[in-house]
């Protein structure tokens, strides 16, 4: 049974890395879009490169599916976000 199948079988959430990218002139729209979206990601620190010119934001979230993970984001942000199933590893 795969790791994802085991997680689903025992009812645990999968871990996803959400990677959002936007243009420099879209920063205001991206951040403002959260004001109209009820999400546990609001008021929570995350990594972003807007202040250094990269205009990307990353979130690590737990969700039941990719769709559930993207639903944590406002539509405008989710449409510009890639999602990757991830897990922790021990680096030797």
Regions found by a protein language model. Name each.
Residues 3-92:
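Conserved, structured core segments of small domains
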